[in-house]
């Protein structure tokens, strides 16, 4: 049933999921999380990791710690033999998150180092904006919050996509993209590369302020001028793509050809 004034937001899975999903057999509770996992040891490990990740990412993105959430975030953990993925669900009302939950699937090591930081970043953004975030900013920021291996893979992929006629999105279109396009991989790759460029330029808090302004008045040229000193979205795009090419040329050939780890 739909409730007027409330929105539920479900970011798409980061990757396709594989394997058999075991039943959830144990629970661990912390100040901000309730973790359901196949064993008490796994539940405790990921619950503690989630609290630490929440603190670190809030400091990185917001320059401050978050207050305790009114309701704990449910994390469902499913250990799988192959593949990995994550999904975050939020309900919003009057600019606030009213409920949140996370599903994690993959090996324990991958969940701790890759998937959990990605999903916690979505939650940090949900608190900051109080509404569904534009896809490029949400997914790009979440990937930036993850491991360096993912970042290198997406950077290489973005270069391939931008050099494939008809596959990449112009930056002006990407900035206003609210729904996942048919080519989700291209969205993820371009979004990561762009967010990394902006974060490296002025930092994470400035990036969030930039996105907030752009979302409020839809004047991305004005937001670009105010926060990054470029005259237009197109000038930013040229600088971003030029740096992306320079990064690829400076990357050792062995790393360029590496494949993404599941």
Each language-model region and where it sits:
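Acidic/His/Gly-enriched intrinsically disordered linker/tail segments
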Residues: 80, 89-99, 107, 111, ...
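Juxtacatalytic substrate-recognition/specificity segment
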Residues: 25-134, 151, 220-223
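Sec-dependent signal peptide recognition
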Residues: 8-16
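Hydrophobic h-region of N-terminal signal peptides that target proteins for export
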Residues: 16-25
């Amino acid at each position: 049933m739909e409730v007027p004034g409330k929105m539920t937001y479900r970011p798409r899975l980061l990757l396709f999921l594989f394997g058999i999903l075991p039943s959830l057999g144990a629970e661990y509770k912390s100040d901000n999380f309730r973790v359901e996992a196949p064993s008490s040891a796994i539940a405790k490990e990921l619950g503690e990791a989630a609290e630490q990740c929440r603190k670190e990412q809030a400091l990185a993105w917001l320059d401050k710690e978050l207050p305790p959430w009114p309701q704990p975030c449910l994390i469902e953990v499913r250990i799988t033999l192959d593949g990995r993925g994550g999904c975050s669900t939020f309900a919003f009302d009057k600019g606030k998150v009213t409920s949140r939950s996370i599903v994690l699937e993959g090996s324990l090591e991958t969940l701790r180092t890759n998937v959990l930081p990605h999903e916690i970043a979505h939650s940090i953004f949900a608190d900051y904006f109080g509404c569904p975030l534009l896809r490029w900013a949400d997914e790009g920021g979440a990937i930036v919050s993850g491991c360096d291996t993912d970042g290198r893979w997406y950077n290489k992929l973005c270069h391939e996509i931008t050099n494939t006629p008809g596959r990449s999105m112009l930056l002006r279109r990407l900035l206003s993209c609210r729904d996942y396009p048919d080519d989700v991989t291209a969205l993820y790759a371009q979004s990561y590369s762009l967010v990394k460029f902006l974060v490296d330029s002025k930092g994470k808090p400035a990036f969030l302020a930039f996105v907030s302004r752009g979302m409020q008045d839809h004047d991305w040229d004005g937001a670009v001028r105010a926060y990054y000193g470029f005259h237009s979205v197109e000038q930013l795009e040229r600088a971003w793509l030029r740096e992306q090419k320079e990064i690829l040329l400076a990357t050792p050939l062995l790393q360029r050809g590496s494949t993404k780890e599941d």
